[in-house]
Swiss-Prot record:
Name the UniProt record assigns to this protein: Large ribosomal subunit protein uL16
Keywords: Ribonucleoprotein, Ribosomal protein, RNA-binding, rRNA-binding, tRNA-binding
Family: Belongs to the universal ribosomal protein uL16 family.
Phylogenetic lineage: Bacteria, Pseudomonadati, Pseudomonadota, Alphaproteobacteria, Rickettsiales
SUPFAM superfamilies: Ribosomal protein L16p/L10e (SSF54686)
Pfam family for this entry, one: Ribosomal_L16
CDD domains registered for this protein in UniProt: Ribosomal_L16_L10e (cd01433)
Gene3D superfamilies named in the record: Ribosomal protein L10e/L16
One GO term describing the cellular component: cytosolic large ribosomal subunit
Task performed by this protein: Binds 23S rRNA and is also seen to make contacts with the A and possibly P site tRNAs.
Record's subunit section: Part of the 50S ribosomal subunit.
Length: 136
């Protein structure tokens, strides 16, 4: 799974997802891409599940780019623990995805295969998405 090699701080503030994405809104590598419509937090596990689904659908042909990276540590307190006594320990990493951000790109497979793969990826993610083409 994706995770940063080094971090400056162990724990992060909860934060908010920014409004419309300013960078990463156009296709950079592939001919087809998956663009977010909502802003939400996407975990490393969800990204990995999407990657596996897409590579399986593409039968390991073509190329898949993941344009997001989970760099925010999300902490959680154990179950049935009373309030207070500090912040919980880091549980997993996530990325804050803004609306309009390109998350996945595909190149080198037929159009129907690419669209099917991106639909499978979309089903694994907690945000509403749209499939975009390079020349649309």
């Amino acid at each position: 799974m994706l995770a940063p090699k080094k971090q400056k701080f162990r724990k992060a503030h909860k934060g908010r997802v920014a409004s419309i994405a300013k960078a990463g809104t156009t296709l950079a590598f592939g001919s087809f891409g998956l663009k977010s419509i909502d802003g939400w937090r996407v975990t490393a596990r969800q990204i990995e599940a999407g990657r596996k689904a897409a590579t399986r659908c593409m039968k390991r042909q073509g190329r898949l780019w993941i344009r997001i990276f989970p760099d925010v540590p999300v902490s959680k307190k154990p179950a049935e623990v009373r309030m207070g006594k500090g912040k919980g320990s880091p549980e997993f990493f996530a990325v804050r995805v803004s609306p309009g951000r390109i998350m996945f790109e595909i190149e080198g497979v037929e159009e129907n295969v690419a669209l099917r793969a991106l639909e499978l990826v979309s089903a694994k993610l907690p945000v509403r998405t749209r499939i975009v083409r390079r020349y649309e």
